[in-house]
Swiss-Prot record:
Pfam families linked to this entry: Sua5_yciO_yrdC
YrdC-like domain boundaries: 3-188
Keyword ATP-binding in record: yes
Cited PROSITE patterns: YRDC (PS51163)
Protein name, as recorded: Threonylcarbamoyl-AMP synthase
UniProt catalytic activity: L-threonine + hydrogencarbonate + ATP = L-threonylcarbamoyladenylate + diphosphate + H2O
Lineage: Bacteria, Pseudomonadati, Pseudomonadota, Gammaproteobacteria, Alteromonadales
Subcellular localization, as worded in the UniProt entry: Cytoplasm
Principal location: cytoplasm
Organism domain of life: Bacteria
GO molecular function: ATP binding; double-stranded RNA binding; L-threonylcarbamoyladenylate synthase; tRNA binding
The organism of origin for this protein: Shewanella baltica (strain OS155 / ATCC BAA-1091)
E.C. numbers: 2.7.7.87
Length: 188
């Protein structure tokens, strides 16, 4: 498994690779959100059913506009999300019609976050788009907290490990329904 810095990982992602990378709280698994084959590989590695959907992380909201149907959100709903970003808040937002079922699962919405983590920001800026994100663990197990755990659990299953440090968060992000304001998962 290649171990690379964020600036060196772009080609692997754009060629359909699945990567592990540090986030605010845990290591994540990620891939190109526009490549269904890569998303299916990520789901297989994690042993996660596609119906559950995935999260997109981005360096700014502009990167999410290809996936989120902002016309279904009020100015107040968007302002609330913007007041929490960048940061450890994931918002469930309506999707555009073309979004892959492997991203949104069985829902008509998608979970999105503008990350404050420098490494995630660098990855998304290098790609000029968001990154699929899910915790680096097999379904039902604890997420990886170290590069050593990634190497032990995912060697031969993913294409690269992004070097870097975890952020300061010790809990997963809070998930909020952007339309109703309801907290779906209490995080940090």
């Amino acid at each position: 498994m290649l171990q690379l810095h964020p600036s060196d990982i772009k080609d692997i992602i754009l060629q359909g690779g699945v990567i592990a990378y540090p986030t605010e709280a845990v290591y994540g698994l990620g891939c190109d959100p526009d490549n269904d084959t890569a998303i299916q590989k990520l789901l297989a590695v994690k042993q996660r059913p596609w119906q559950k959907g995935l999260i997109l992380v981005a360096s700014d909201f502009q990167q999410l506009l290809a996936y989120v149907d902002e016309s279904q959100l009020t100015a107040e709903q968007l302002e609330f999300a913007f007041s929490k970003w960048p940061g450890p808040f994931t918002f469930v937002m309506p999707i555009k019609a073309h979004v892959s079922k492997y991203l949104c699962g069985e829902f008509d919405s998608i979970a999105v976050r503008v990350s404050a983590h420098a490494g995630v920001q660098a990855l998304c800026r290098a790609l000029n788009k968001p990154l699929v994100s899910t915790s680096a663990n097999l379904a039902g197990e604890d997420p990886a907290l170290t590069a050593a755990e990634i190497l032990a659990d995912f060697t031969g299953k993913i294409d690269a490990l992004v070097l870097g440090e975890l952020g300061e968060q010790r809990q997963p992000s809070t998930i909020i329904d952007a339309r109703s304001g309801k907290i779906l998962r209490n995080g940090q």
